């Protein structure tokens, strides 16, 4: 399993889930949603059942394990969480295309993630700090 910046979950390079969060303007609260394909997936998507033939992998079992892991993550420092996130990030080193809501498109190499979670993309002209946008993986450092 790998992550695609900022919030997609990948199995073998194919999306099987994602996270979405929305805050009010004052940022006094955040609503977080998680969608994960467990036993079924739309066409061209992956599902967790692809990893195992274990019939005990049901939504309630998965939810219990997810909550346990979230509890473990809550005990970690921000620095350690950042390290773990970056270690599992499939986006790094790849040539990416960032599509912004204003229809602007930028192409460059994903070179890092800053401590605030923003993607660092090196274009031919400069290093950009990306806060939001749709990311398309074009190829990795080896040209794939």
Model-predicted segments: where are they?
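Alpha/beta catalytic cores of group-transfer enzymes, especially the acyltransferase/condensing modules
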Residues: 3-7, 12
């Amino acid at each position: 399993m790998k992550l695609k910046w900022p919030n997609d979950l990948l199995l073998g390079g194919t999306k099987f889930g994602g996270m979405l969060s929305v805050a009010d303007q004052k940022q006094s609260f955040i609503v977080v949603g998680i969608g994960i394909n467990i036993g079924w997936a739309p066409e061209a998507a992956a599902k967790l059942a692809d990893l195992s033939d274990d019939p005990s992998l049901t939504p309630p079992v998965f939810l219990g394990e997810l909550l346990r892991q979230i509890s473990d993550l809550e005990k970690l420092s921000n620095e350690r969480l950042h390290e773990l996130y970056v270690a599992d990030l499939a986006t790094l080193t790849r040539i990416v295309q960032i599509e912004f809501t204003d229809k602007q498109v930028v192409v460059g190499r994903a070179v890092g993630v800053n401590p605030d979670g923003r993607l660092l993309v090196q274009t031919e002209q400069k290093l950009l700090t990306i806060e939001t946008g749709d990311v398309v993986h074009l190829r990795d450092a080896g040209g794939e």
